[in-house]
Amino acid sequence: MRHGDISSSHDTVGIAVVNYKMPRLHTKAEVIENAKKIADMVVGMKQGLPGMDLVVFPEYSTMGIMYDQDEMFATAASIPGEETAIFAEACKKADTWGVFSLTGEKHEDHPNKAPYNTLVLINNKGEIVQKYRKIIPWCPIEGWYPGDTTYVTEGPKGLKISLIVCDDGNYPEIWRDCAMKGAELIVRCQGYMYPAKEQQIMMAKAMAWANNTYVAVANATGFDGVYSYFGHSAIIGFDGRTLGECGTEENGIQYAEVSISQIRDFRKNAQSQNHLFKLLHRGYTGLINSGEGDRGVAECPFDFYRTWVLDAEKARENVEKITRSTVGTAECPIQGIPNEGKTKEIGV
């Protein structure tokens, strides 16, 4: 793992993350014009970072947040489509891979269903090699149709890559799912705003450590008339330490190299902190000392996960007992979100 140079090697993947200024757009024509700006940025960045194998742009960087629902549906994209064609050409021209945001992607039943919040991974030949739909939209604000699975794709130089989006990253389950599928780099594209800056920086570092994985975060910056975005795009090592991190500057770029051999060596040979291995070989030292074999315990010990898999409605019922039974709350009502219909009494 290296930081400070502009190169890469046969063993390292050069990764750039961008603090892209959050655009405020309203029409398809504006979206296309902005996509061309992103494409120009990709080509320009490769001139300055000749080792760049992968560039990552934030959630909402292509379209911005469409606060008007009619605009959201009108600008929803097909994949492949005009936007991805622009990005594909840039990746070919720059001989680099890229991760780009489409907010949103037309639902199969468009316009009767809400669009998806989608990322695409495009290789240096201009091919879409991964399309990920955000599994956990940022409710109650985001109105995207939820996706349903994560993916792992062999990326530049064979590095295995998963994509996740913004609020996905607040749930340890999604990181673990990607890592257990073999991801060596988890890319988190986000359009995260204040006040959650410290929490999001902490979460990315903790999940890199907990899952023995590289993490690349690309976050928005600037003010779009509604939210202020804190940037801090970063590349994080599989030991949870930051290799490179932006500040809050608009269109800031950070760059680092991640070693393919180092992460594979760690996952094979690390012992006390090999979290992926130890989770499925629990207590192996104690079982060896007890004459019960040398592989530890594989069975899942967590009741919540067993219930969720075997009876999802029961798991939902259980969580509502410790939270609430409606998606909204009357103490802070949001238009269009049902709540329990009670109003908080002053002083209670």
From Swiss-Prot:
Gene3D superfamilies: Carbon-nitrogen hydrolase
Reactions it catalyzes: a monocarboxylic acid amide + H2O = a monocarboxylate + NH4(+)
UniProt cross-references to InterPro entries, sorted A to Z: Aliph_Amidase/BUP, Aliphatic_amidase, C-N_Hydrolase, C-N_Hydrolase_sf
Disulfide bonds: none
This protein's record includes keyword Transferase: no
Claim: Hydrolase is one of the keywords in the record: yes
Top-level enzyme category: hydrolase
Recorded GO MF terms: amidase activity
Keywords, in A-Z order: Hydrolase
Active site: 59 (proton acceptor), 134 (proton donor), 166 (nucleophile)
E.C. number: 3.5.1.4
Ranges for domain CN hydrolase: 13-260
Temperature impact on function: Thermostable up to at least 50 degrees Celsius.
Function comment: Catalyzes the hydrolysis of short-chain aliphatic amides to their corresponding organic acids with release of ammonia. Also exhibits in vitro acyl transferase activity, transferring the acyl moiety of short-chain amides to hydroxylamine to form hydroxamates.
NCBIfam families referenced in this protein's UniProt entry, alphabetically: PRK13286.1
The family this protein is said to belong to: Belongs to the carbon-nitrogen hydrolase superfamily. Aliphatic amidase family.
Protein name as annotated: Aliphatic amidase
Underlying gene: amiE
